[in-house]
């Protein structure tokens, strides 16, 4: 049977209880099994790194996923979703290095690669378990015992298989290119891994001496002085106009400079020149005949072996000088230009960011520390035209935050540029939420994509499955562990991590030995193969053939350049199509001011702290309802607490009828809604219709992943329609006899609505939904599904839908609100009845609503009658005040205006208005008995209220409240005041609903006592008083005795259990 619940919502208690129930009943597995005959839905979880505690962003991400999957499950989708864990790469290595106190790769090598690998493995697995428990506390349902983990050999094989596909399709390439490089981690990093932030760097203008021309210099600008020792060329734009001009200093000294004509003034300003004279102009293409000298040739001997020339490039812009310093070893554009013109790819910098021997005098110096040294050397050689600083957005390593540099190194690449057009076609075939996430944001990123550098010079990652012969140089790409063991002639098993796999060699046809290249995969390649790796492909094709590609994925908007992109690239290589059918892009979590959360700013919020204080359902409801999923979520504690209060109200909504239902032994299995249909009131039909409308609205919202709208619809329904309206309407019906059809109708309707709302909230607030389901449904129907999450999603019952009634009720609620405002103006509390409410409707629909729901209107306005005027008609008891217009009267009557105005004010308003309407004028009798004609423009009119009334506007029209008291109304008002206080005292004693009491009330004011005595029986009935002593001098006693001030009248009240 239905049982009472605790008075207060206790999230911690409920969540522990429900979690235990889920575990004991094996609810997750049974829920999935229950949907085996449904349409399949394959979801791929974007794997978080196992680096420690979850944060608000990862919590929001998992909550979105869980909510959508629960919704799909209830809509009979058979779901496959394994949680994923990214357990390789720099995110893990950097954390382990921190634990071990390592500063560089040398520390790792000294410690031993195998030891380091084992530490990384141990760290990743330990953190995975901790984070799993944290996600489970959010109420997230996934196959937690069977996650996909990127460190597992079967997962690694999926990456190997994909790379072999790339090799076989000629989409794998090895070569020297200038790539993003982290000097601390000593590895290449992908474009998508570069994080940009503000940084201040040197800004210098350098003069390159033109060979064969006296005192003539090409002027370049750079923010990386450290790259000057690697300079091999200057680039200019072929179509820009350049000038050779004489620049004159204050002391009369001069030199000839070359720069873009448009930028001469900037160059003069930077160099602090006093004057100039243009000697000649030419297009950029005419400068290619020039050669120049390195400004540091005496310090970097290799520079003297290079022929420095001027070359054309479209990437040159009209900024600074229009001449660009080219160092092919330290920039992608520079590198490409160098390759095009067969220039030396000079890269005198090592993996740790220090100059090599090729840098001559600079060898051994860190490039960042070398900037001021290079500047001083340029200054000493009169090659520095100007120096300053610039603050700009600069790339940093995504994990250790070190500023990146560009190095020309040998790397492995996927030829994304060769499949880019097909990738763009596939983007159009995917459903994107919102649409612009794919059509604009993602498309733009892919359009600008370069070949993907997939190799990393690190340790803890998926090893590149490339074996190279030391003798003949032949390459072999291995696709699986079985293939490797077979080709290596091994019979046992091996682990596919470094250094274990590094020890495996493969015989070469030339008689030599193939050894694995030392690089590991870019960690983004790990997660790129998730959609087939989680299906155990390529070891088995069964699940892959049944489920792939993914029906749905969702991640943050940074993944347009991350996981969405890497998945698409890898899938195009492996299968020639996108690995997902639909994608939801969500936003970032920020603080209330819109700033990114970071430990340094002290604005990080732990989702676990929120759960500990307010519960998981509160956190879920907050992040889901705060904004559209694709907008950034600005965390605001006050808003979280508001959501928590809403859930408390929802709890109270559920709690309200339970004591009465339990007391009456109400059994919804015995009394159906259909059996009491003849006893349904209009308000019952209305709430049933509203419930259907909410189902429709939530379905519509969920179809477009508008999770915020879905949650808001449900909470608004619970708070506004149920708590603040319907429950207030039916409250008196719950106090009648147990078998009263009117009461049973209210119970049945409430039960029907509660069953609906319990199911509606279940994807969003799974703990609260389960708690209520077990009490309301499972306790009365043992044949019901074991868990709310096994239930079918509510279907719209068209027989309950009545849109016209919903509109009518909205109209009535607007009138009630206006009546409340008018009461305040009249100084009459709602507890005190009024004789009548007058409504002047503006439309036939409003009048019809009042007629249809008159009883509701009377009840909620606490009035004895509802008076309805004609549509668009004024209330016939209104007065009409005449307001003379001196501006119109004065010019006509001049000195007599002082006699006309007071006489006009005394005319009965309706008479004057009628005369004006019929003839346009009125014969006005003055004080001396003479008459004068006044015209319609000389007076305005203002309606006046009868004494004791007040008015307010509503959506339906004007509403008037007659607040005049009669003795009967006054008696009822005082009676209601007494009842309220006695009920408060019952609550204070925590009495059960049906517990009878003894009451004594002393009222010394004889007039008030006489009024209250007329309704003594009503008071006794309302407060369940078997004994009720009332008088002006009686002794007041009881378990609880209190003094009260009731509308200025002193009363003493006492109550006691019978």
Swiss-Prot record:
How it assembles, according to the record, is: Monomer.
Identify the GO cellular component terms for this protein. Answer: cytosol
The residue numbers the entry assigns to motif 'HIGH' region are 48-58
User: Know anything about its domains from the record?
Assistant: IleRS has two distinct active sites: one for aminoacylation and one for editing. The misactivated valine is translocated from the active site to the editing site, which sterically excludes the correctly activated isoleucine. The single editing site contains two valyl binding pockets, one specific for each substrate (Val-AMP or Val-tRNA(Ile)).
The kind of enzyme this is, by top-level EC class, is: ligase
**Which E.C. number(s) belong to this protein?**
6.1.1.5
Q: Where are the transmembrane segments?
A: none
Source organism of this protein record: Methanosarcina acetivorans (strain ATCC 35395 / DSM 2834 / JCM 12185 / C2A)
Keywords, in A-Z order: Aminoacyl-tRNA synthetase, ATP-binding, Cytoplasm, Ligase, Metal-binding, Nucleotide-binding, Protein biosynthesis, Zinc
Cofactor(s) recorded for this entry are: Zn(2+)
This chain's protein is named Isoleucine--tRNA ligase
Residues bound to ATP: 599
Q: Annotated motif 'KMSKS' region: location in the chain?
A: 596-600
């Amino acid at each position: 049977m239905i049982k009472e619940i605790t008075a207060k919502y206790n999230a911690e208690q409920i969540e522990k209880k429900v979690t235990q129930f889920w575990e004991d009943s094996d609810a997750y597995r049974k829920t999935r099994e229950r949907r085996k005959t449904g349409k399949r839905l394959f979801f791929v979880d974007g794997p978080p790194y196992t680096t420690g505690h979850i944060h608000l962003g990862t919590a929001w991400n998992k909550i979105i996923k869980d909510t959508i999957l629960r919704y799909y499950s209830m809509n009979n989708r058979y779901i496959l979703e394994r949680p994923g864990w990214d357990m390789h790469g720099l995110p893990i290595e950097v954390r382990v290095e921190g634990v071990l106190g390592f500063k560089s790769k040398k520390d790792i090598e000294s410690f031993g690669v195998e030891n380091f690998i084992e530490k990384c493995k141990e760290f990743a697995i330990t953190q995975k378990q901790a984070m799993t428990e944290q996600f489970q506390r959010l109420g997230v349902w996934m196959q937690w015992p069977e996650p996909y983990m990127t460190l597992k050999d079967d997962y690694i094989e999926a990456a190997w298989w994909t790379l072999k596909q790339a090799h076989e399709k000629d989409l794998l390439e090895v070569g020297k290119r200038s790539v993003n490089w982290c000097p601390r981690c000593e590895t290449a990093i992908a474009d998508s891994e570069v994080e940009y932030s503000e940084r201040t760097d040197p800004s210098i203008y350098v003069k390159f001496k033109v060979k064969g021309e006296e005192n003539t210099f090409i002027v370049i600008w750079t923010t990386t002085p450290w790259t000057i020792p690697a300079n091999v060329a200057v680039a200019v734009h072929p179509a820009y106009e350049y000038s050779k001009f004489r620049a004159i200093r204050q002391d009369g000294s001069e030199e000839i400079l070359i720069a873009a004509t448009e930028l001469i003034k900037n160059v003069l300003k930077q160099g602090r020149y006093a004057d100039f004279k243009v000697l000649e102009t030419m297009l950029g293409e005419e400068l290619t005949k020039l050669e120049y000298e390195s400004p540091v040739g005496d310090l970097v001997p290799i520079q003297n072996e290079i022929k420095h020339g001027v070359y054309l490039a479209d990437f040159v812009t009209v900024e600074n000088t229009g001449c660009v310093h080219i160092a092919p070893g330290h920039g992608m554009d520079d590198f490409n230009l160098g390759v095009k013109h067969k220039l030396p790819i000079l890269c005198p910098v090592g993996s740790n960011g220090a100059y090599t021997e090729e840098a001559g005098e600079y060898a051994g110096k860190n490039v960042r520390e070398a900037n001021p040294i290079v500047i001083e050397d340029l200054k000493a050689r009169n090659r520095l035209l100007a120096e300053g600083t610039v603050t700009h957005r600069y790339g940093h390593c995504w994990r250790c935050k070190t500023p990146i540099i560009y190095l020309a190194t040998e790397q492995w690449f996927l030829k994304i540029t060769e499949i880019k057009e097909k990738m763009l076609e596939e983007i159009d075939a995917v459903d994107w939420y919102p649409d612009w996430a794919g059509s604009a944001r993602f498309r733009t990123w892919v359009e600008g994509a370069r070949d993907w550098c997939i190799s990393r010079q690190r340790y803890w990652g998926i090893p590149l499955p490339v074996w190279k012969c030391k003798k003949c140089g032949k390459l072999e790409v291995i696709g699986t562990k079985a293939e490797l063991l077979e080709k290596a002639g091994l019979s046992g098993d091996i682990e596919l991590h470094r250094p274990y796999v590094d020890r495996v060699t493969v015989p070469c046809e030339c008689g030599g030995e193939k050894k694995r290249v030392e690089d590991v995969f870019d960690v983004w390649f790990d997660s790129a193969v998730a959609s087939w790796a989680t299906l155990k492909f390529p070891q088995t094709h069964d699940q892959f053939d049944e489920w792939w590609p993914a029906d749905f994925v969702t991640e943050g908007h940074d993944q347009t350049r991350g996981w969405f992109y890497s998945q698409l690239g890898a899938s195009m290589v492996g299968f020639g199509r996108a690995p997902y059918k639909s994608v939801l892009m969500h936003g970032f979590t920020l603080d209330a001011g819109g700033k990114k959360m970071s430990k340094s700013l002290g604005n990080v919020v732990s989702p676990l702290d929120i759960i500990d204080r307010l519960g998981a359902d509160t956190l879920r409801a907050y992040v889901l309802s705060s904004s559209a999923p694709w907008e950034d979520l600005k965390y605001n504690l006050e808003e979280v607490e508001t959501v928590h209060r809403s859930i408390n109200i929802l709890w109270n909504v559920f709690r309200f009828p339970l004591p009465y239902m339990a007391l009456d032994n109400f059994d919804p299995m015995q009394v159906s809604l259909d059996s009491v249909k003849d006893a349904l009131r209009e308000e019952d039909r209305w709430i049933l219709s509203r419930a259907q409308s909410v189902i429709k609205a939530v379905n519509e919202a969920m179809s477009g992943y508008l999770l915020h709208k879905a949650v808001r619809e449900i909470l608004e329904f619970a708070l506004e329609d149920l708590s603040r309206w319907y429950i207030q309407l039916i409250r008196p019906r719950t106090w009648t006899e147990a078998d009263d059809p009117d009461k049973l109708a209210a119970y049945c309707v409430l039960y029907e609505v509660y069953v609906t709302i319990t199911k509606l909230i279940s994807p969003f607030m799974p703990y609260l939904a389960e708690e209520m389901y077990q009490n309301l449904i499972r306790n009365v129907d043992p044949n019901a599904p074991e868990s709310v999450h096994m239930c079918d999603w509510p279907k719209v019952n068209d027989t309950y839908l009545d849109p016209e009634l919903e509109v009518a009720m909205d109209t009535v609620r607007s009138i009630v609100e206006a009546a409340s405002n008018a009461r305040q103006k009249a100084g009459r509390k709602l507890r005190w009845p009024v004789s009548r409410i007058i409504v002047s409707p503006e439309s036939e629909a409003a009048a019809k609503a009042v007629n249809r729901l008159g009883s509701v209107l009377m009840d909620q306005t606490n009035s004895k009658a509802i008076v309805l005027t004609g549509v668009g008609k004024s209330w016939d008891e209104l007065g009409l005040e005449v307001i003379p217009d001196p501006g119109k009267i004065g010019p006509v009557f001049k000195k007599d205006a002082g006699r006309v105005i007071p006489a006009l004010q005394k005319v009965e308003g309706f008479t004057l208005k009628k005369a004006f309407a019929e003839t346009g004028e009125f014969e006005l009798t003055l004080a001396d008995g003479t008459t004068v004609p006044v015209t319609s423009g000389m007076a305005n009119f203002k309606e006046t209220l009868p004494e004791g009334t007040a008015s307010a506007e509503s959506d339906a029209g004007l509403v008037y409240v007659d607040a005049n008291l009669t003795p009967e109304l006054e008696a009822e008002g005082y009676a209601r005041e007494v009842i309220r206080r006695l009920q408060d005292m019952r609550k204070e004693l925590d009495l059960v609903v049906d517990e009878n009491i003894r009451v004594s009330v002393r009222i010394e004011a004889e007039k008030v006592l006489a009024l209250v005595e007329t309704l003594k029986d009503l008071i006794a009935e309302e407060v369940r008083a078997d004994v009720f002593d009332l008088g002006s001098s009686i002794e007041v006693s009881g378990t609880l005795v209190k003094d009260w001030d009731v509308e200025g009248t002193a009363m003493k009240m006492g109550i006691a259990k019978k």
